[in-house]
């Protein structure tokens, strides 16, 4: 089960104002098949296509904390 925090939900609007568009599916795809994952308390999944996702995982529950574009 994947769910987005309130901040992560707001992040879509924040990025849209800057003409940066991501979908929920893109965020979930990064977690499902990342190019790289690091863990420092929380997980950081990255894709070479320019998207990083910070999330936590407890059992089968994945909580999306935030996400952001990268170069």
Regions from the PLM with identified roles:
Residues 1-71:
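Ribonuclease/tRNase effector modules and their secretory precursors
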């Amino acid at each position: 089960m994947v769910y987005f925090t309130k901040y992560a939900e707001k992040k879509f609007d924040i990025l849209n104002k800057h003409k940066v568009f991501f979908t929920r599916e893109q965020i979930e795809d990064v977690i499902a098949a990342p190019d790289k994952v690091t863990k420092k308390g929380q997980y950081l999944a990255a894709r070479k296509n320019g998207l990083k996702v910070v999330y936590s995982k407890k059992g089968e529950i994945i909580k999306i904390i935030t996400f952001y574009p990268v170069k």
